[in-house]
From Swiss-Prot:
Cysteine disulfide partners in this protein: C80-C198, C215-C223
Signal peptide: 1-28
Lineage: Eukaryota, Metazoa, Chordata, Craniata, Vertebrata
Annotated source species: Rattus norvegicus
Residues bearing glycans: N108, N157
Key words, A-Z: Disulfide bond, Glycoprotein, Hormone, Secreted, Signal
Full protein name: Prolactin-3D4
GO biological process: cell surface receptor signaling pathway; female pregnancy; mammary gland development; positive regulation of cell population proliferation; positive regulation of lactation; positive regulation of receptor signaling pathway via JAK-STAT; response to nutrient levels
Gene Ontology terms for molecular function: hormone activity; prolactin receptor binding
Origin: domain of life: Eukaryota
Keyword NADP applies: no
Keyword Membrane: no
Post-translational modification (record): N-glycosylated.
Major subcellular site: secreted
Subcellular location(s) of the protein: Secreted
Amino acid sequence: MQLTLTLSGSSMQLLLLVSNLLLWENMASKPTVLVSTEDLYHRLVEQSHNTFIKAADVYREFDINFAKRSWMKDRILPLCHTASIHVPENREEVHEIKTEDLLRSIINISVSWKEPLKHFVSAVTDLPGASASMRKKAVDMKDKNLIILEGLQKIFNRTQTKVEENENFDYPAWSGLKDLQSSDEDTHLFAIYNLCRCFKSDIHKIDTYLKVLRCRVVFKNEC
């Protein structure tokens, strides 16, 4: 009886091993589903448009409930930290810029917001009087920016015949953390306001130029 039990146990282990091997071979034989460039553009345009709407909502709520009118006369609105990133400023420049150069520009914008948005979420979460909706949208803005960035990088890599190991990207540094963490309420709120204002502007750029690129790449400029 004891020998029979031992053999049964060994047989069971062998059966499980074979089953696992067959399962692994079956999974390995299935090709990874590759999202087409066209579908990536469609998804990214949808994501960027929805993110812009949320950014506009957050900006509007902050402007109504927290912004101070005295800022308009007492403070000078600083340039956004992404101001140095070149993007087309008119229809002629849009027509002339290469696809990979425009992709590079909006990738630079998206990357430059990774760090600021982390701190923005913390600031909005801790902001007395901020609505639950505002807090949730701030988190969504951060998360969607990362999703958009990932998709942009995939598309960019597909435009290259050979992707260089040290691709020439220029990510502007953000220097607003000190003001954002300031104990002075006015300075702190003004820093949040500028993040709201600048991200709304930048995600609008990303959304606009993604639509330009989709028109060019997917619809062959017939849109």
